A protein has these predicted regions:
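Glycine-rich phosphate/diphosphate-binding loop of Rossmann-like nucleotide-binding domains
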Residues: 1-2, 107-192
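N-terminal beta-loop-helix "entrance" segment that forms/cooperates
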Residues: 1-11
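Generic hydrophobic/aromatic pocket-lining and core-packing "Φ" positions
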Residues: 2, 59, 97, 138-139, ...
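An anion/phosphate-binding loop that grips the pyrophosphate of nucleotide cofactors and donors
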Residues: 22-23, 187
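Short glycine-/small-residue-rich Rossmann-like dinucleotide-binding loops
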Residues: 24, 30-31, 50-51, 176, ...
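Phosphate/diphosphate ligand-binding glycine-rich loop within oxidoreductases
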Residues: 25-103
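Adenosine-phosphate binding glycine-rich loop
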Residues: 73-115, 224, 229-271
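Rossmann-like adenosine-cofactor binding region
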Residues: 164-247
Length: 271
């Protein structure tokens, strides 16, 4: 609360402009809004999630400002792990299955299929594109609910590891365009979990691929913050999270962890 900040010695200012005017370093969670661009000063340090690969406008504005920009998502340890991106990826990966299962419901435009099935009725088929933190957490959640899960990745060593630690209803497959195309007709839920450090995600599912999927299939593109790994992905909001193209439900909310702030805040604080 504001009172707790004051007790700790912080000064509460009325507007963002007031803060930018006196601060040498700005610590945020999400990238600066367009309205904040004129407030940023030369040599001012900004520390936040930027996701530059998804926004030319943001990148150009920060370059023009001559500020020092440090992106949470590209801070690396010696072992190349991403300590500030990992907790949000864990949250987003688990959330992806929650929202995907919800939007598979008929009232939401989905197929009307229960993710885990019931005795005598087959569970849903879940395809996870990417075996990193997001993909691993998504696969765990989907498997725990009883779905049939396939993880695709181009890192064979990672696939071997996942094959050892995942339950029996999770299979792994080397990711190729052909493998993805072959999987799409029978898939019910696709999780886009591709990450290239600091770069735009490649499009693994193209516009024409939607025709291969059954109406009501749900796509959750967690990679939307980095441009999305599904060509038809465009950023949405928590207020208006989905849209349909060719009968395929797209959930492409940027900053998915923002929906669960009590969990996300604690996870980031502990990073």
């Amino acid at each position: 609360s504001d009172a707790q900040y004051k007790e700790a010695g912080a000064v509460i200012l009325a507007t963002a402009a007031d803060v930018y005017a006196i601060a040498d370093m700005i610590v945020k969670v999400k990238e600066p809004l367009a309205a904040e661009f004129p407030l940023i000063k030369k040599n001012q340090i900004l520390f936040t999630y930027f996701h530059f690969a998804a926004s030319r406008e943001l990148t150009s504005a920060m370059l023009s400002s001559d500020a020092v920009c440090i992106a949470y998502e590209t801070v690396e340890l010696a072992d190349r792990s991403l300590p500030l991106l990992t907790p949000m990826s864990e949250v987003a990966g688990r959330m992806a299955i929650q929202v995907g299962a919800f939007y598979l419901g008929k009232p939401q435009g989905g197929k009307g299929k229960l993710l885990g099935g019931v005795p005598g009725v087959k569970p849903a088929n879940v395809l996870v594109l990417g075996g990193g933190v997001v993909g691993t957490q998504a696969a765990k959640m989907a498997a725990g609910l009883g779905a049939n899960v396939t993880i695709m990745d181009t890192n064979l060593a990672r696939l071997r590891y996942l094959d050892e630690v995942m339950p029996a209803n999770v299979s792994t497959q080397f990711s190729t365009s052909y493998a993805i195309q072959e999987a799409l007709p029978s898939v019910d839920l696709v999780i886009g979990a591709v990450l290239l450090h600091g770069a735009k995600a490649p499009h693994l599912i193209k516009r024409d691929d939607l025709k291969k999927m059954a109406p009501g299939t749900v796509l959750v593109d967690v990679a939307v913050d980095q441009g999305g790994c599904i060509e038809t992905c465009k950023p949405t909001t928590h207020e208006n999270p989905i849209y349909e193209i060719d009968g395929i439900v797209h959930y492409c909310v940027a900053n998915m962890p923002g929906a669960v702030p009590q969990t996300s805040t604690m996870a980031l604080m502990q990073a």
